[in-house]
């Protein structure tokens, strides 16, 4: 992993990736909604709230096939997920892929159930009696974003700030 301190002009130390990872893996309920940024076919940006879950070094989210975000990802899989976690804001760039293997779908269905939404896995996607209105009608596809680059900014009160970019090995 390549790391660059974006706050060295202020004499601040770089943020270790372990700090971001600790926030991602804490299991604390999020008070802020993660947002997914995609690109429309004409190049205009699109941003939508998603229920993102960090699992095994990757971010997962769901979306209905007919939604703008899913249609955008079908044309251009590059995307960004931004989130505010305890003590750190993160922006994670990566490439989204639709997940179809049953083992991963079952594992992530359990992770979502642990957070209060218990989808069933049916025909390579999630189903349930409800989801976020922006997800479109069921079934909902599961997507995985493998991080390529991430940016972190410390937000904890009472400590010096910091900003760091991390580039991950492909």
Regions found by a protein language model. Give the residues of each.
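Charged, gly/pro-rich active-site loop segments
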Residues: 1-16, 88-170
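Short, conserved active-site entrance elements at the starts or edges of catalytic domains
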Residues: 8-41
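A generic local structural motif
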Residues: 20-22, 47-48, 66, 130-131
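Short secondary-structure boundary/capping segments
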Residues: 26, 51, 71, 133-135
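Short beta-strand segments
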Residues: 31-65, 71-73, 79-83, 91-95
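A generic structural signal for alpha-helix starts
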Residues: 67-68, 103
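Short, intrinsically disordered, mixed-charge
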Residues: 74-79, 110, 114
